């Protein structure tokens, strides 16, 4: 029997044996291991039978239980295997650090703030956009986490929301109330995944009781409403502009807005509009001759 066939029959790869040999020789050079994996063209998957399993206790001691939990749930969908990498767990650790630092940066401004849903429904401008993303994140999280069991995509939505909050520059007290709502939302959504840091932040924010006893928030349907949408405008099939229109606008209203836009006028001026095609909420195509 050829060596290659023997390895395949016993579910052993060249990469596994290379890693095993290095470990037996006492060599733990990560760069060398990565080099060998690149040259061989395969990586060594974790398996007890292959003696290359990561000790969870070591990972917890180095990065904390929350980081390990976050990394495992974020690395891949639950039905798929994944390759444990230092880069991956370090990325999870950095995210939790960023979240922790962000909370502490704004803690003095938001700790004593209280708000009601009805009150925040009246915010305008950037705060309104941020609030919409907060509640879209809640809706997506509940679907991914509770219905689809796609924990990795649920976590990705939380990460995206943190990016949005970091880009938000609150100026007024109402802005800071929206910021608090966003931070509380991230904390509540993280609590089943990273319970220790979530509990700590929940207490830092001045909330009473344990976060573990708090329900996952429900999305506010009013916050999810879109008042204005941006639609692409084509002239004779070629994209010429993107125009904002009311989300509930009828075709005649959209037509008036589009044809009065300077960027569109450039391509239709002096020509006959033969057709105006509006695919509601998605596309406008103006046919001219």
From Swiss-Prot:
Motif residue range(s): 'KMSKS' region: 45-49
Subcellular location: Cytoplasm
Catalytic reaction equation(s): tRNA(Leu) + L-leucine + ATP = L-leucyl-tRNA(Leu) + AMP + diphosphate
InterPro entries, alphabetized: aa-tRNA-synth_Ia, Leu-tRNA-ligase, M/V/L/I-tRNA-synth_anticd-bd, tRNAsynth_Ia_anticodon-bd
GO cellular component, one term: cytoplasm
Residues annotated for ATP binding in this entry: 48
Gene Ontology BP, a term: leucyl-tRNA aminoacylation
Gene Ontology MF term list: ATP binding; leucine-tRNA ligase activity
Subcellular location, principal: cytoplasm
Source species, domain of life: Bacteria
Keywords for the protein's UniProt record, in alphabetical order: Aminoacyl-tRNA synthetase, ATP-binding, Cytoplasm, Ligase, Nucleotide-binding, Protein biosynthesis
Entry EC no(s): 6.1.1.4
Chain ranges passing through the membrane: none
Subunit structure, as described in the record: Seems to consist of an alpha chain and a beta chain.
Family the entry assigns: Belongs to the class-I aminoacyl-tRNA synthetase family.
Protein name: Leucine--tRNA ligase subunit beta
Organism: Aquifex aeolicus (strain VF5)
């Amino acid at each position: 029997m050829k060596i290659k066939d023997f390895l395949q029959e016993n579910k052993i790869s060249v990469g596994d044996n290379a890693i095993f040999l290095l470990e037996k020789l006492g060599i733990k050079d990560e760069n060398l291991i990565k080099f060998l994996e690149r040259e061989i063209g395969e990586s060594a998957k974790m398996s007890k039978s292959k003696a290359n399993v990561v000790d969870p206790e070591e990972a917890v001691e180095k990065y904390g239980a929350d980081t390990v939990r976050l990394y495992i749930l974020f690395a891949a969908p639950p039905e798929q295997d994944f390759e444990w990498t230092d880069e991956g767990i370090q990325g999870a650790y950095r995210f939790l650090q960023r979240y922790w630092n962000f909370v502490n940066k704004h803690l003095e401004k938001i700790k004593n703030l209280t708000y009601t849903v009805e009150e925040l429904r009246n915010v305008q401008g950037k705060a309104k956009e941020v609030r919409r993303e907060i509640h879209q994140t809640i809706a997506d999280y509940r679907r991914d986490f509770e219905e689809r069991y796609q924990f990795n995509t649920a976590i990705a939505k939380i990460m995206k929301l943190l990016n949005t909050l970091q880009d938000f520059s609150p100026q007024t007290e109402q802005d800071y109330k929206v910021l608090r709502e966003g931070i509380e939302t991230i904390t509540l959504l993280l609590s089943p995944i990273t319970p220790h840091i979530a509990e700590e932040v929940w207490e830092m924010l001045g909330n009473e009781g344990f976060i573990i006893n708090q329900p996952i928030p429900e999305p506010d349907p009013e916050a999810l409403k879109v008042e204005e949408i941006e639609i692409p405008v084509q002239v004779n099939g070629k994209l010429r502009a993107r125009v904002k229109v009311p989300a509930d606008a009828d075709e005649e209203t959209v037509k008036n807005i589009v044809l009065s836009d300077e960027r569109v006028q450039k391509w239709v001026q002096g020509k006959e509009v033969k057709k105006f095609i509006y695919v509601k909420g998605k596309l406008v195509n103006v046919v001219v001759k």
